[in-house]
Amino acid sequence: MPTNDIKLGQSVTGKIVMVFFGMTASGKSTLAKAWADFCRAAYYNTDRVRKELAGLQAVEKRPDGVGQGIYTAALTEKTYEAMLDHAGQDFSRDVKMVVLDGSYSRRADRDRVRSMTAGMGGRCVFIFCTCSEKEVRRRLELRARDPEAVSDGRWEIYLHQMQTFERPDTGLEDDCIRLNTEQPVAAMLQWLAAQPCLQG
């Protein structure tokens, strides 16, 4: 495991929001939480925030269909608003880095993060997490057997996202880094820590 976590977290210049996003089972939550721990950063996960807003326990299973139950557009909107509120509150307390973890499948939702962060004098870095379909299947099978899993992502959700996910346009979203998560977490943390966008 990398050993420069405290140095990196303390050396960040200004406010920064790190958004780990991608489709279900892309590895974003594993990496986002590891990065937040690595940097001693504040961390917020959309699955947890959504269930808090719905009055549910984080590990309570809700196999609702797309756009149904706790996954309606209205609650999704509230979830992303709450994520931004948390980040804003942290910045007001002089927190340097906030990590947001969620699908952020629409560019409009990513742009809202950019707008809020810029309004507070900060900057964003988006990490677009990807992996092969074979790995998605493997991870979803493991998740289905894990009683502590927070995400309700399933194969049908993945198939829906394949059709609807607004992938980042490198020409218009130049603050995005694409990362294949089929590698050791420690190696990914070292790679991220070396990125020029995090050096100042």
Regions found by a protein language model. Give the residues of each.
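Extreme N-terminal, non-catalytic leader segments
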Residues: 1-17
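Hydrophobic anchor at the beta1->P-loop junction of P-loop NTPases
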Residues: 20
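The conserved Walker
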Residues: 24
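Conserved lysine of the Walker
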Residues: 28
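Conserved substrate/cofactor phosphate-moiety recognition/catalytic segment
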Residues: 33-93
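Conserved nucleotide-binding/hydrolysis micro-motifs of P-loop NTPases
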Residues: 48-51, 104-106, 130-137, 183-185
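Conserved phosphate-donor/acceptor-positioning beta-strand/loop module used by diverse small-molecule
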Residues: 120-140
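Small-molecule kinase domains that catalyze NTP-dependent phosphoryl transfer to phosphate-bearing small molecules
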Residues: 145-191
